[in-house]
Structures are given as C-alpha cells and as structure tokens.
C-alpha cells in the first residue's frame, strides 16, 4: 500500500517542501492536487498572514484558503495567552501581519520598551533591524516575557539559505541572556492544532528540516515523512539524533505515492551496509539503483550505531557513483 493511502490528512511544511521563495518545487503542485487528501500547510514562517500565504499558494495553482494555513505567528499569539492577561501590552518584533494577529487576539500592540509591555513576541520579517531588536531586548531586561514564533536559524530561498528568525532571536538572547519560549515547530502544538482542525486521526507530517518538521511531528506522536528538497540532506539524516529521525524518506513529495515499505530505512537497490569500527561501509548496488536507495540502506545501519559514523565509505563502484553527491 502506498504511504499516502495509509493516512487521512497531510500536514505540510512550505519552505523547502512545497516551494523555495516564489518557485514551486518540481512536482509538488501536481502531487498535492492529485492526492485527494485534506491538507493544512504548517509553516514556521511568521512573516505573512494566513490569507497572504493562501494567495501565494493559489498563485502556484494550489487551492487554499486561510483556513488551510497555520503559521507560527498564530501559534505565538495562542502561546501568549498562557503567559499574559487579556488586553495586555505586547511588543511585536516582526511583520505588520504579526501585529494584526496580536491585536486580533485582544492585546494592545506597542513598539517601545518605554510602554512597559508584558511580553515581547518575535517573528521573522525581512525588515527587522537593530532598532526593533533593541526595543525588544530592553523590554525583556525589564521583565517582559520573551516569546519567539520559531527558532529556525535559516530560511530556504531560491538563492540559498537566508538568515532565519532563530538567528535574529539569537541576537536578542545574547544581549539579554534570556532564552525565549517558542511557539512553532519543533513544539508539537502546531501539529496537534492542525490535525484537530481537519478532524484527522492518522495525519502524515511532511517536511524538509529534521530539527523542526520531523522533530515536531515526532513530538506530536505522528508519522513523519522527510523530503530532500530543502534544508536537511543525506549527511544530516545519517547523523540525526533519535528524536529527529523520520519514519519515511523520499526525494520529494511525489514519493508519497510509492509503497510505504520502499520509503522506510532498510536494504534496497541491492546495496548493503555494515559497520567497520567507527565507519559505515556501503557496498554492492544494482545497475539501476539510486542514491536514495543507498541512503535508506545506510540509514538503518547508521541509526543502530551508538554514535554517528565517522566516515561514510563506499566500497563498490556503484556505491561510489551514487553517494558522490551526498551533502
């Protein structure tokens, strides 16, 4: 049975999974439109309102409304309610749409530490600079609760990995020596909220980043599917901590149409893997075997080792051929 038929909903990451910047990832749109499963796009990118994200999805031919989108900014507003009183002053570091969400949550939005905010919430926005970060830091030093929408250190774009919200949060954390509570992935709350919105009992979490998408799905006790179209690639998978390991691995979203057993870590494509001291050796391989088949073969053995392999050593010519592009 295909992986997709074993589940009743998709909880999809966006950046690096469905698109990069403004460009749809090859095959993603066709697969999502053809799979016939209800989906929610669960994104750590707090720079756009759900309505804007839905418009962007529609622009690449994916049918979506604001109800099909759950952002870390929305999750941050929900989290704020656990820390401050209704109507409290909140200093927002981030996009205008984030400020609107905070206002819609019943809070008073301020922009200066002099306003004595009860909380500082920080989300990604390309325009964030020294002034906003400093006002946030001053407020936190005065006792404001510090909430981050997400802690992704980088953001996939068409030109490569850009600075993410987590890197900007790190500047404030360094200045204040206060670590924020985080609302977004890898915390499980977003996935639980998304599944509840769809009435799903067997959701599949799909993403490209091990430390957010996969870790969050695992924390929510959901099945996870990792794609190689974004941030975390082969070496990251081989070195992944237990809580960051996906149940299934594919090259892209389209692989969800494959038999689930093909997507699990384990021997395939005629490859074999074995431990040699601190190293992992990959051998054999059928003539038409692929890189991802070698990866799944290697993962089963690598994940059984007490520590990540020191070196990945290809033995056969086929193994050398297919793993030369691993990164």
What are these regions (language model features)?
Residues 2-12, 20-22, 26, 34, ...:
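Asp-based, Mg2+/Mn2+-dependent phosphohydrolase catalytic module
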Residues 37:
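Conserved phosphoryl-transfer catalytic core
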Residues 42:
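Glycine-rich loop-to-alpha-helix module at the N-terminal edge of alpha/beta enzyme cores
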Residues 45:
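Conserved phosphate/oxyanion-binding catalytic-loop motifs
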Residues 50-51:
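Switch/connector loops and helix/strand junctions flanking conserved nucleotide-binding motifs
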């Amino acid at each position: 049975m295909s992986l997709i038929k074993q589940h009743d909903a998709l909880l999809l990451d966006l950046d690096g999974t469905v698109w990069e910047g403004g460009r749809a990832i090859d095959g993603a749109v066709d697969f999502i439109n053809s799979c016939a499963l209800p989906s929610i796009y669960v994104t750590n990118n707090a720079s756009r309102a759900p309505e804007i994200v839905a418009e962007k999805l529609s622009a690449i031919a994916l049918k979506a409304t604001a109800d099909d989108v759950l952002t870390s900014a929305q999750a941050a507003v929900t989290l704020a309610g656990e820390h401050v009183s209704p109507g409290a002053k909140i200093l927002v570091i981030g996009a205008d749409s984030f400020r609107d969400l905070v206002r819609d949550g019943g809070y008073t939005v301020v922009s200066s530490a002099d306003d004595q905010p009860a909380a500082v919430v920080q989300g990604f926005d390309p325009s964030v600079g020294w002034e906003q970060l400093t006002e946030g830091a001053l407020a936190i030093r005065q006792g404001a609760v510090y909430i981050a929408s997400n802690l992704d250190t980088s953001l996939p774009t068409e030109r490569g990995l850009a600075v993410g919200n987590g890197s900007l949060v790190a500047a404030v954390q360094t200045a204040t020596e206060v670590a924020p509570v985080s609302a977004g992935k890898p915390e499980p709350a977003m996935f639980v909220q998304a599944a509840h919105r769809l009435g799903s009992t067997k959701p599949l979490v799909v993403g490209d980043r091990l430390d957010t998408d996969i870790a969050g799905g695992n924390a929510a006790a959901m099945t996870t599917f990792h794609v190689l179209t974004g941030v975390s690639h082969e070496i990251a998978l081989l070195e992944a901590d237990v809580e960051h390991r996906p149940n299934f691995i594919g090259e892209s979203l389209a692989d969800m149409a494959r038999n689930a057993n093909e997507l699990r870590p384990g021997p395939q494509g005629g490859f074999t893997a074995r431990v040699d001291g601190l190293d992992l050796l990959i051998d054999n391989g059928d003539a038409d075997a692929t890189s991802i088949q070698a990866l799944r073969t290697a993962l089963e053995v690598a994940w059984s080792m007490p520590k990540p392999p020191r070196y990945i050593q290809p033995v056969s010519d086929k193994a050398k051929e297919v793993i030369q592009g691993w990164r």
